[in-house]
Amino acid sequence: MFGKGGMGNLMKQAQQMQERMQKLQEEIANMEVTGESGAGLVKVTVTGSHSVRRVNIDESLMEDDKEMLEDLIAAAFNDAARRIEETQKEKMASITGGMQLPPGMKMPF
C-alpha cells in the first residue's frame, strides 16, 4: 500500500505539520488586531486569543449618547474578532495546503 519508507515519511510529514501548526497557533495568540466602527471613531485592539488590549474612543463621541457609544464599542470588538478569524483561516490554509479542518479540530487528529 505504501512504498518503501512511505508510512515513515507520511508520519514524519504529519509531525512536521503538527509542529508548524503549533507554532502558528502561538503566533496567532500573540498577534494584535484592531477592529473599528463609526468610521474609525471607535477602535478596539485585541490579541489573537481575544483578550482586549486597548479601547480607543474619539473625543467627539464623549458628548453623544451612551447607548450609541456602547453599540460602537461592541461593533468594533466584533470587527476585530472577525479579522482574527480571517487571519487564522489564511494562516492555517498556508500550512494545510488549503485542507479545511473542522472548527475546533487541532492537529494531531
Curated annotation (Swiss-Prot):
One of its GO terms (molecular function) is DNA binding. InterPro entries: YbaB-like_sf, YbaB/EbfC. The keyword Transmembrane helix does not apply. Keywords: Cytoplasm, DNA-binding. Its main location: cytoplasm. One of its GO terms (cellular component) is cytosol. It comes from the Bacteria. It is found in: Cytoplasm, Nucleoid. The keyword Ubl conjugation does not apply. Residues 1-22 are annotated as: Disordered. Belongs to the YbaB/EbfC family. Homodimer. Binds to DNA and alters its conformation. May be involved in regulation of gene expression, nucleoid organization and DNA protection. This is Nucleoid-associated protein VC_1055.
